[in-house]
Amino acid sequence: MAQYTWTVREGSLDGPVVMKNYVYGIPDKEPVEGQELYLSNGSGPWRVRLLEHVPGVPRSPYNILVVERVED
């Protein structure tokens, strides 16, 4: 199965775009809510708040990963 390509948004489903075409760095896995991660553009750490995806369509612009900044 192909990995999902995500549009990463900050704060909400209509929040500012942090990154487009993000692919999670671990093969055969996807991020989960509550997880902390760094994006491939070098930004982070971020905490995953919400994942919205189109089942069976890994390269959809409607695959949205909502994140929030992790405070030190």
Where are these regions (language model features)?
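Short, basic/aromatic beta-hairpin or loop at an interaction surface
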Residues: 1-20
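Short alpha-helix capping/helix-loop boundary micro-motifs
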Residues: 19-27
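Short, well-ordered loop/turn sites that connect or cap secondary structure elements
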Residues: 29-32
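Short beta-strand-centered aromatic/proline hotspots
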Residues: 44-54
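Short, solvent-exposed secondary-structure boundary/capping segments
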Residues: 54-69
